[in-house]
């Protein structure tokens, strides 16, 4: 059996279906039978187009001869390559030609199938001839009924979807309301009273004593229609604010020279710029902040009004409508107004005569807010906190008395506290005095070119005191003319001037007094500059005085003078400078150069001729030079003999 030729046995598959799956309960699932196209594709996959077309006998003989030859080979020559000899010489050529012919035939068949579409056409399925054709009317009725059923299904589905969307929107709005309420609670104080949610806008928790309740109510926003599109600025939460806290407000503080008509003052006219209402500005947080600001402004104005009535001053304060008028200095008035705009009334058109620049002092408004917060802090700190009830034994007076006990003066000074109005009036006085000082210095600097005046303001100031350093110099001679350096300390009602040598002069709030003082200092600067220039040029200072008692009397300060002599002593220059009279320069020549010098019979010695003669005035306006010091330098250089 083993030595005989191999016999090929053809086994066909049974017609039964193959089992695809057996379930747990014993049910068998069969593979569905293949269609004609699937069966054809399966059979085509079995064809091996590379296999030769020899007969089965030739193949069997070659296989048997190959096996016999393989057995006859020795085992040690297994690695060597063995070639089977051909049965006849043209056997290989025949096989190659046959394979080439087979491939060409297959290629021809494939091209024919691709080119001719009739080979790819399948036979139509035969229909039952007994089936009668349905009339077209019945077809239309059936289609209409089918479409109606489908439409009802679609409408029911759309209704369910819209209902689900509305429920989701309601749930989302409820969630948004809760989240907004949580956010509101994190920023504002809320409490539940019955079925209402109330909030507090007042500053009572910070120490405020203002009697306004400042209560607002939180409500749910139900004005929106769920069937329509929700706007972008929609907020599920809304707040109800008291009507007297609606709108915006601020405290206007201004200093005016002429008092306006008090009876024409109103609330709306003070609001020059009406803010346009934006949709985003109607959110609850912006409305609550604006309402709290209105409440704070009303508290500030109420405190100022109460103090204005209670304070006893030489010039009483006036409280009219929403305005408080005070006079810090003669001819000036301080106006503090409460400007409240609810946005309901339209702003009146301002007349041309009232179109003035905004004189609102924002610094004082900011200081008012700081002062009221300090007042709240003091009120809150004065509350007695919990403390131990036990104390050491002994009499209370003996326990409190001692070497560190307060006397009557200290106790009375502690009891004297300044109110909000007094502090803001003092700050207004200081601000006005500082601005007027700066204006005076700037006017002198722009009006007088020689000498030059410079002001260096300090950045570190107080609400009641400021300082400025004033330098008076001459252009081109800044290094040698540094004698006039003033430190002005601007207080509430006076100005303290500190000289370079430490002298202190106190000036009042009058503008003319400061201007006269600076003019006298500028006049003295010219004389000091001549003194410093004489030292540099080698001239000798014969006399110097800041206050000359001779000559015309100056209405502003006193005149100053100096006399210098040339290095050889032949020439002398006398300078007299006054704030009003101006500069006067005299030159004294030797007697030998005097034209009208005659011989005296009494003086026969020639040495007396070397004495200087009378003074001659110099036409100072005709001198060349850009400033006083430069002209004086040219004059000294002309009178100095060459070595």
UniProtKB/Swiss-Prot annotation:
GO MF terms, alphabetically ordered: transcription coregulator activity
GO BP of this protein: regulation of transcription by RNA polymerase II
Keyword field contains Transcription regulation: yes
Region (Disordered): 53-82
Keywords: Activator, Nucleus, Transcription, Transcription regulation
GO cellular component labels: core mediator complex; mediator complex
Comp. bias regions, Basic and acidic residues: 60-73
Any Pfam family the entry gives: Med17
Alphabetized InterPro entries for the sequence: Mediator_Med17
Subcellular location per the Swiss-Prot or TrEMBL entry: Nucleus
Highest taxon of source: Eukaryota
Entry function: Component of the Mediator complex, a coactivator involved in the regulated transcription of nearly all RNA polymerase II-dependent genes. Mediator functions as a bridge to convey information from gene-specific regulatory proteins to the basal RNA polymerase II transcription machinery. Mediator is recruited to promoters by direct interactions with regulatory proteins and serves as a scaffold for the assembly of a functional preinitiation complex with RNA polymerase II and the general transcription factors.
Entry's family note: Belongs to the Mediator complex subunit 17 family.
Subunit structure: Component of the Mediator complex.
Protein name: Mediator of RNA polymerase II transcription subunit 17
Natural source organism: Danio rerio
Gene name in the database record: med17
């Amino acid at each position: 059996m083993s030595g005989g030729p191999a016999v090929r046995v053809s086994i066909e598959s049974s017609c039964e279906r193959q089992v695809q799956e057996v379930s747990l309960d014993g049910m068998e699932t069969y593979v569905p039978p293949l269609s004609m196209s699937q069966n054809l594709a399966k059979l085509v996959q079995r064809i091996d187009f590379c296999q030769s077309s020899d007969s089965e006998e030739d193949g069997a003989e070659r296989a048997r001869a190959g096996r016999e030859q393989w057995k006859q080979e020795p085992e040690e020559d297994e690695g060597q390559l063995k070639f089977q000899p051909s049965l006849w010489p043209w056997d290989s050529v025949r096989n190659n030609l046959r394979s080439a012919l087979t491939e060409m035939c297959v290629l021809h068949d494939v091209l024919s199938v691709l080119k001719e579409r009739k080979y790819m056409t399948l036979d139509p399925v035969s229909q039952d001839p007994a089936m009668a054709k349905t009339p077209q009317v019945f077809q239309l009725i059936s289609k209409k009924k089918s479409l109606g059923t489908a439409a009802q299904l679609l409408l029911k589905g759309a209704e369910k979807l819209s209902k689900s969307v509305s429920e989701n929107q309601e749930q989302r709005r409820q969630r948004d309301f809760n989240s907004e309420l949580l956010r509101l609670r994190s920023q504002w104080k809320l409490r539940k009273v019955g079925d209402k949610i109330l909030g507090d806008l007042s500053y009572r928790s910070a120490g405020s004593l203002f009697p306004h309740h400042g209560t607002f109510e939180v409500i749910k926003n139900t004005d929106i229609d769920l069937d329509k599109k929700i706007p972008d600025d929609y907020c599920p939460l809304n707040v109800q604010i008291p009507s007297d806290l609606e709108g915006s407000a601020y405290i206007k503080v201004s200093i005016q020279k002429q008092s306006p008509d008090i009876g024409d003052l109103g609330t709306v006219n003070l609001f020059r710029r009406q803010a346009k209402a934006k949709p985003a500005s109607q959110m609850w947080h912006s409305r609550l902040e604006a309402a709290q600001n209105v409440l704070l402004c009303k508290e500030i104005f109420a405190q100022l009004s109460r103090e204005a009535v209670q304070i006893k001053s030489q010039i009483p304060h006036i409280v009219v409508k929403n305005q408080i008028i005070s006079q810090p200095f003669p001819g000036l008035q301080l106006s503090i107004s409460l400007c409240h705009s609810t946005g309901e009334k339209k702003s009146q058109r301002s007349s041309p005569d009232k179109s003035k620049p905004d004189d609102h002092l924002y610094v004082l408004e900011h200081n008012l807010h700081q002062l009221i917060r300090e007042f709240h802090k003091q009120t809150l700190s004065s509350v007695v906190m919990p403390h131990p009830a036990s104390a050491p034994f002994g009499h209370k007076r003996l326990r409190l008395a001692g070497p560190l006990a307060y006397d009557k003066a200290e106790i009375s000074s502690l009891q004297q506290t300044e109110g909000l109005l007094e502090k803001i009036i003092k700050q207004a006085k200081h601000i006005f005095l500082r601005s007027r000082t700066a204006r005076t210095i700037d006017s002198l600097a722009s009006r007088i070119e020689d000498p030059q005046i410079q002001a260096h303001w300090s950045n570190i100031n107080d609400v009641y005191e400021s300082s400025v350093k004033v330098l008076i110099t001459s252009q081109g001679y800044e290094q040698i003319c540094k004698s006039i350096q003033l430190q002005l300390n601007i207080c509430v009602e006076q100005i303290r001037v500190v000289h370079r040598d430490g002298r202190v002069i106190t000036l009042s709030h009058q503008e003319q007094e400061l201007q006269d003082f600076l003019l006298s200092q500028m006049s003295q600067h010219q004389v000091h500059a001549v003194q410093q220039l004489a030292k540099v040029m080698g001239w000798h200072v014969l006399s110097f005085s800041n206050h000359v008692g001779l000559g015309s009397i100056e209405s502003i300060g006193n005149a100053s003078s100096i006399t210098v002599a040339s290095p050889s002593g032949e020439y002398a220059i006398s300078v007299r400078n006054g704030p009003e009279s101006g500069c006067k320069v005299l030159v004294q020549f030797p007697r030998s150069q005097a034209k009208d010098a005659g011989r005296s019979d009494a003086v026969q010695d020639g040495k007396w001729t070397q004495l200087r003669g009378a003074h001659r005035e110099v036409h100072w306006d005709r001198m060349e030079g850009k400033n006083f010091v430069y002209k004086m330098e040219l004059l000294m250089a002309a009178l100095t003999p060459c070595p």
